[in-house]
Every structure is written in C-alpha cells, then in structure tokens.
UniProtKB/Swiss-Prot annotation:
InterPro entries: Chorismate--pyruvate_lyase, Chorismate_lyase_/UTRA_dom_sf. This is Probable chorismate pyruvate-lyase. It comes from the Bacteria. It is found in: Cytoplasm. It catalyses: chorismate = 4-hydroxybenzoate + pyruvate. Disulfide bonds: none annotated. Removes the pyruvyl group from chorismate, with concomitant aromatization of the ring, to provide 4-hydroxybenzoate (4HB) for the ubiquinone pathway. Gene3D superfamilies: Chorismate lyase-like. It comes from Alcanivorax borkumensis (strain ATCC 700651 / DSM 11573 / NCIMB 13689 / SK2). Its EC number is 4.1.3.40. One of its GO terms (molecular function) is chorismate lyase activity. Pathway: Cofactor biosynthesis; ubiquinone biosynthesis. GO terms for biological process: pyruvate biosynthetic process; ubiquinone biosynthetic process. HAMAP family: UbiC (MF_01632).
Length: 204
C-alpha cells in the first residue's frame, strides 16, 4: 500500500519552496528516470499492486484538469532493490491519455512506467511537488514527490514516495532519521495553517 498522508491538509507544495537535506533533495529533484538511477544500487524489480479504473483524488483531479466524476486508470506499485521495497509509486492516467501510441501505458504489468515515459519520444515534465507521508502505524515519515508528465500531448500524474529502506540501502539512514524532527515541525505547521517558510529542515 502507498503511504497515507498524515493529514488531509498536508498538501503538495512546490519542491523549490522547501529546504531539504541535500541527499533527499538530490533524489527528489532528479529530472532523470528514477528506475535507471535505482538500478545502480542493486537488482531492480516492480511489484504491482492496485490496477483499476477509479476516481482520482481531488488534488490529482485538479492537476489533470479532470471533471469531478471522470474516472482514470489508477496504478500503484512498489519498486524493489534486492527484493526490498524502497519506493512506493502511484500513477493516474486519464483514459483519454491511453489512446493510440500511448495505449501500452495502460498495460505495464511488472514493467517500469518510468522507463516507458523516458523512451522516445521523451515526455515533458511539469513542476515537481512534494509532501510528507507516514509509512506505517508507527508514523515513520517519508518524503513523496508528484509530477505531471506529458507523453505525446497526453497528461498523466506520477507520485513517488521514498521509503526508509532506500536510505538504509544507500547507508545514509542515520542522517535522514536525524532530520525527521525538523520535518515533523514543517508538517505540523502546514496542518495548522502556519507559515512554513520559517521552518528550516535539517541539512547534512
């Protein structure tokens, strides 16, 4: 399952407005294929989860300019390194975006959607948005990013959550964990509607 947002008011915010630890920003702001990058660190695999025609969430609908009752293909997967889940991903593909040469995007199975997006013709990518999410009942935190892609003129939305196991794999887990107290301060300021530009997340 994808991480659940800690609070419905913990909204997506433009990535460039956030002060993040360098290692997290490096991954969140990387414009290239996440799949290709992950493959450098071990055996990569995609484990499919939800794959259904359903109504997008309100924030997803707004970013895709979809009518309120317009369904889309929702796909949720986890990306694994050496059989360990390191990224949870959710894609929202309007049915009108799955026509013609884009039809294969709706039948990815255990293949990486990211690799397909970066195959020719290479997709266009809009602004990157970010937010915090919880990963389990203990409220372990992770950062997620969301981007809108345009493939052959058709829009789709991809959200990726970087799970704690990724930082363990990169041997930087201790540094990332040290930043969570500051990250929580940012999140709770967001929930309360307080200014977040004064909440500086830790650096390392």
């Amino acid at each position: 399952m994808l991480p659940a947002a800690l609070h419905p008011d913990s909204l997506w915010r433009p990535l460039e407005q956030l002060v993040l630890p360098p290692i997290i920003r490096d991954w969140m702001a990387d414009p290239d294929s996440l799949t290709r990058r992950l493959k450098r660190y071990g055996h990569f695999s995609v484990v499919p989860g939800l794959h259904a025609i359903a109504l997008p969430r309100a924030d997803e609908r707004r970013l895709l300019s979809l009518p309120v009752r317009r369904a889309a293909l929702i796909r949720e997967v986890t990306l694994h390194l050496d059989d360990t889940p390191v990224v949870a991903a959710r894609s929202v593909l309007p049915l009108t975006s799955l026509a013609g040469a884009n039809r294969s995007l709706g039948h990815m199975g255990s293949r990486s959607l990211g690799l397909e997006l970066y195959n020719r013709p290479i997709c266009q990518r809009d602004q990157v948005w970010a937010r915090l999410a919880s990963t389990d009942q203990h409220h372990s935190l992770c950062w997620g990013r969301q981007s809108r892609f345009i493939k052959r003129g058709a829009p789709l939305l991809v959200a990726e959550y970087f799970l704690p196991a990724l930082w363990e794999k990169l041997h930087v887990a201790r540094c990332v964990q040290a930043s969570w107290l500051h990250d929580k301060a940012y999140l709770y300021a967001s929930i309360r509607g307080e200014p977040t530009d004064a909440v500086r997340l830790s650096r390392f």
